[in-house]
């Protein structure tokens, strides 16, 4: 099978490696152009570009594939049988979708039609979904609207952050895409309706939700929220949820909500703290306790929340006792909105 691969972040690397290892001919890799990143704002290649070059594959980096007619022709001349897309970062135009005879297929990190769009992993965590998964979808001009060929579900635990969940979903995408490509090859060529009928795809229902682009304010911890919502913000937007501490930014990296009904899902250290503080008596964001070797307990609009790991502006990451010592917090101190 001659495959044209489209992807950009680290999330897309396992699928490229899996397809290459399965013996398919990767005729080209399309990724986003090099971007300036980090403190030094150095021009850096995407994770997929680095991976593709290590495999000796041809790389294409259109700034905007929709209007880059020259790149579109170069890709058409590769005569790929199929296009595989995982987190590319641009919407493919109809002219590109119609190029490969076996279609364009996308590995999407949600249970479609829930969380169509660019941030399905983050939104599944932010909204407290009990499960998520991966779908292999035939691409259309609409955003993540196509019929689903394969799908696999994955439970979400309370202690998972977006990085950990993303790693699991990226590996799951790789496994599922290799299986999907074999099915697509066996189904053979024909009109799109004929191919999709032979593949017995599932058409998406109408009860959809959209994973909108995240805004700056989404990353700001709102201590007036309940503990569980604050926890979901921290874990869903890992490692970027932030608050203020003595006029410096503090990235909050790991929390546990001190909620009785979640006692089976939190750590032994957190369970030992249940019931020690009366709910809602202190101003949200107030330090209620600095627990040696555990972390810092903070008030919310409801039950308290335990901060287990954080990173103060200009400092390294600290957890448990190191966090207590670095912040030098006292009961009654307050975190600030930033």
Swiss-Prot record:
Gene Ontology cellular-component annotations: cytosol
Record's keyword terms, sorted: Protein biosynthesis, Transferase
EC number: 2.1.2.9
InterPro entries, alphabetized: Fmt (IPR005794), Formyl_trans_C (IPR005793), Formyl_transf_N (IPR002376), Formyl_transf_N_sf (IPR036477), Formyl_transferase-like_C_sf (IPR011034), Met-tRNA-FMT_C (IPR044135), Met-tRNA-FMT_N (IPR041711)
Entries under Gene3D superfamilies matching the protein: 3.40.50.12230
Superkingdom, taxonomy of origin: Bacteria
Its biological purpose: Attaches a formyl group to the free amino group of methionyl-tRNA(fMet). The formyl group appears to play a dual role in the initiator identity of N-formylmethionyl-tRNA by promoting its recognition by IF2 and preventing the misappropriation of this tRNA by the elongation apparatus.
Family stated for the protein in its record: Belongs to the Fmt family.
Name under which the protein is recorded: Methionyl-tRNA formyltransferase
């Amino acid at each position: 099978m001659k495959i044209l691969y489209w992807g950009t972040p680290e999330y897309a690397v396992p699928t490229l490696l899996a397809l290459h290892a399965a013996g398919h001919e990767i005729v080209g890799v399309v990724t986003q152009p090099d971007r300036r990143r980090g403190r030094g704002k150095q021009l850096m290649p995407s994770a997929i570009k680095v991976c593709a070059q290590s495999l000796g594959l041809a790389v294409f980096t259109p700034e905007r594939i929709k209007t880059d007619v020259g790149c579109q022709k170069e890709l058409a001349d590769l005569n790929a049988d199929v296009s595989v897309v995982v987190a590319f970062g641009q919407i493919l135009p109809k002219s590109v979708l119609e190029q490969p005879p076996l279609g364009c297929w996308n590995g999407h990190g949600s249970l479609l039609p829930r969380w169509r769009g660019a941030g399905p992993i983050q939104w599944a965590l932010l909204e407290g979904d009990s499960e998520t998964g991966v779908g292999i979808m035939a691409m259309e001009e609409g955003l993540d609207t196509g019929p689903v060929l394969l799908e696999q579900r994955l439970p979400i635990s309370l202690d998972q952050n977006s990085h950990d969940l993303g790693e699991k979903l990226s590996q799951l995408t790789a496994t599922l895409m290799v299986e999907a490509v074999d099915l697509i090859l066996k189904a053979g060529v024909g009109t799109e309706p004929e191919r999709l009928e032979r593949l017995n795809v599932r058409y998406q229902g109408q009860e959809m939700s959209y994973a909108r682009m995240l805004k700056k304010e989404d990353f700001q911890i709102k201590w007036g929220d309940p503990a569980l919502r604050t926890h979901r913000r921290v874990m869903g937007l890992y490692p970027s949820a932030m608050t203020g501490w003595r006029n410096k930014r503090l990235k909050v990296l790991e929390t546990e909500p001190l909620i009785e009904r979640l006692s089976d899902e939190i750590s032994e250290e957190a369970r030992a703290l249940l019931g020690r503080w009366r709910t809602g008596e202190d101003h949200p964001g107030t330090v209620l306790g600095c627990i040696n070797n555990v972390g810092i307990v903070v008030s919310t609009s409801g039950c308290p929340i335990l901060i287990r790991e954080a990173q103060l502006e200009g400092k390294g990451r600290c957890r448990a006792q190191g966090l207590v010592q670095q912040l030098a917090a006292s009961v009654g101190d307050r975190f600030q909105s930033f």
